[in-house]
Amino acid sequence: WRVLGVTRQLEKERIDIFHGLSNELPLNIHKSEVKSIVTIHDLIFLRYPQYYHSIDRNIYTYKFRKACENADRIIAISECTKRDIIEYFGIPADKIEVVYQGCDTSFTHPVTEEKKREVRAKYQLPEHYILNVGSIEERKNALSAVQALTMLPEQIHLVIVGRHTEYTDKIERFIKENKLEERVHIISNVPFDDLPTFYQLAEIFVYPSRFEGFGIPIIEALYSGIPVVAATGSCLEEAGGPDSIYIHPDDIKGMANAFKQIYSDPERKKVMIEKGQIFAKRFSEEKQAEEILNIYKKLMR
């Protein structure tokens, strides 16, 4: 039905535009009168094929390529994703529009002191910590942040929020070998309502991922008023802006030095926070909606 039935239903209902929000379109929609748009989030399965099973890569490649070829317009969630669509699928640049994503509005306003006390007690969060949020997998590279922690004063901790995976086992082996059990806190199953407080209690946010389509956790951190240290190599500079600090994902010493710079220079930290919060405003839901609506209007001219 998703392949053939959707198009028949769209034509029956006399729909003007179909927008595929997650990388795919009905295969026959280009043969209909219905205009189509597809949003492509990333092509990580082509950029880093080693992280995917071959059958999944083949399915994704076929579906994503067909969607890009058949769509009237393509929305990429970053300039990085746009470049990948051009490189891997040979799509003309003028067919692709970049529309950045935002984050949930719960990250855009301060949590109460009572909520901070409640969350700190509930999860036994340390007084001074660097935060990492995201799925705990090889590509996300959280181990590098743990390694960098060994170069920092003992009172500084690392909190990693994410679901337990095989890669978590690798991190935990390093923690045990380096006697970091008291300084690294891996926390799973955090309710979304508690997540903004994790950010606002943190002193630094680190996102050492090797590759992302965009990087919403960075936007969450900027809105939350904490400085960001992120990896080079994909789109994270687009999310973090010019005042965050970027290091190569394998540069452990560089990451540790970035943390030290922030901790040792309160004025720089203040500037990073203030400019980061200003930069984050460009990712509002209102702006995203306006840009998508303009694409719809242009398509109907």
Model-found features: residue ranges?
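Carbohydrate transferase catalytic cores enriched for Leloir-type hexosyltransferases
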Residues: 1-301
